[in-house]
Amino acid sequence: MCNVKKLLLVILICLPALTFAQDVTNSKVVATLRFQIFDKYLIIPATVTNSIDTLHFIFDTGAEITTFNQETAKTLKLESKEMAGMSGTDDVVINVPISTISLLYLAKTRIPFVKVYLENLTQFKGSPVRIDGIIGVDLLKTFVVTIDYEHQVMQLYRAGKTPPEVKGKRMPLALNFKTPVIEAMISLPDGNTIANRYHFISGGEYGILFNWPFVEKYHLNTLLPITNTDKVQDLFKVLTYTNTTVPFLAMGAHRVEQVPASYSKDVDDASSITEVAGAIGYFVWKQFRSITINYNERELFLEK
């Protein structure tokens, strides 16, 4: 009995040290990736199990699934025995082959058994490097991610509590299905403001992309001045976007002036549970020195 008491005493004494050790471990950067920026997309290097060649993935927080270039899959002899549906901005679903990457290496760390949807990523042909895939949520679920725009590096910490050295002001994060969501407020030319929820999209080629039901509800197509229009090829068809400017966007303690915004009648990336106004993209996030995303703890840190 005496030995049991001694053992319990030792465990109680060691618990704070063990807890501290866990915190210290989580504070350690497990990988540092130097990224390139192409056409508002962040490109990070990676390797896979059966190849020594460096692959290049677009990192996009809005990517609920990981896509992989069909040409790269053929080169790596990545087999596919299943089909699954995926959709674009216009919500048209197409069936594509799927496969699994046994180990995806990111510098000195890795993600095991990454399910990938095989697609021809022809829209990135102008990139300085071949785009081999697009990854988002699979990376966010595995690591706490810091995007350092000032030095163009991405730092990865093991998933867990946000490391104490992370800089910036905290904002709560929510999820719409698997996509990160934040609260934000826009101003209108008449001085009125509208607060709502927005998808947090690191790779968006825009400042704000409004969902059409939100545009209709608040008459943004008449209240906001029209700059011009663009035609963009989506997965299945060409979409027409109307471009405008929002006087300012406020997110927590931060405010960004003169934000370019767009909308299209074909865009409605909304939630079935609560209203989502749209998405906030790269033009806004590049205004910050760094951004840290703790997907599992539902936290976002913005450093100006």
Sequence positions of predicted segments:
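Bacterial Sec-dependent N-terminal signal peptides
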Residues: 1-27
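Pepsin/retropepsin-fold aspartyl endopeptidases
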Residues: 20-304
